[in-house]
Amino acid sequence: KTMSSVRVHPEVLSALAEQRPVVGLESAVITHGLPKEPRPELLQQLGDPFATKSHLPVHLALAEVMEESVRESGAIPATTAVIEGELVVGLTDAERHELAHHPSAIKAAPHRLSTMIATKATGGTTVGGALTLLHRGHPDLKVLATGGIGGVHRGWINRPDISADLTVLSRTPLMCVCAGAKIVLDAVATFEALETLGIPVLGCGCRSFPRFHAPGDGTLPIHCCTPPEAARIAQTQWKIGSAGVLITQSPPPPWALELETLETVTQKSVASVTASGPDATPALLGALDQASSGRALLANLALLRHNAVLASVLAAEHLQPLHHDL
């Protein structure tokens, strides 16, 4: 066993061996993306399964909801993380707890993985980190669910802050399910970068690039398709290249925000935040949560669960023999 090998949970390995669907999950959302204290009123507003966990800190409640939602949708969850320098696909309950309560968890982006292994560090994977672990962990892991991908930051002209989520997705043959790019990013620049990198962008039930907490406004058109069609397009994509496929859906209607309102609040938040680098996005999302009186956080949690369910459907579709005889 080499230092850089990936430990895959036995449950995940047996599901893959039996051709049962598996959904990969990132964990920076747990370590960096959400409040680490309980917000019982907020979680109760969302109803079950969040309401039953309203006593838990938000980040831990979400971690459990994601795994349970995948299971209820007929797939096996494989949460990725770096635990004491080990690359892990499929956390135990104890590891999930350790990760959520770790006092100095690192954001496990691709450029940090080797240092984290060498220093035996612990941290939550970004989309780019999760894609790397899933692809190295087992070639049949084909689906990752997240909230919103990283991309090109607002103000990129002054500081070219571009997430490795994009470059890693461009060379890793997985489906990544999201609600578009995080709202704190430049959606147009991110959309253009996806095209430049040769990453197909599909919409399940939507015709324009969703804006994370809000649906798209029609300005960034994407190919609208059903989950079986999306799985077939992904299969076709991997016959002609190694780029991943970005599969988007709008946030669920009762919780979605209106784009105009969201944009106004986001611009205020962006102006108020000075953090840069890996701390930028968590700080911006925190400011947005406050400025929107918690509505952005409600939408964020709802769309995360929504994406876990779609990812489970896609993981099952991917296994249908129909998609292999192209």
Outline where the language-model segments fall.
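Active-site glycine-rich loop that binds ribose-phosphate moieties when present
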Residues: 124-127, 156-170, 175-195, 226-232
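A C-terminal functional module that forms or caps the active site or interfaces directly
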Residues: 237, 243-306
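Divalent-metal (Mg2+/Mn2+/Ca2+)-assisted nucleotide/phosphate chemistry catalytic cores
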Residues: 90-173
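Short, ordered loop/turn segments at secondary-structure junctions
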Residues: 27-30, 82-85, 148-151, 179-182, ...
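Glycine-rich nucleotide/cofactor/substrate-binding loop typically near the N-terminus or early
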Residues: 27, 32, 40, 44-116, ...
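Anionic-ligand binding region
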Residues: 213-238
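N- or domain-start disorder-to-order transition segments that initiate the globular core
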Residues: 2-19
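Short coil/turn connectors at secondary-structure junctions
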Residues: 17-21, 25, 72-77, 111-113, ...
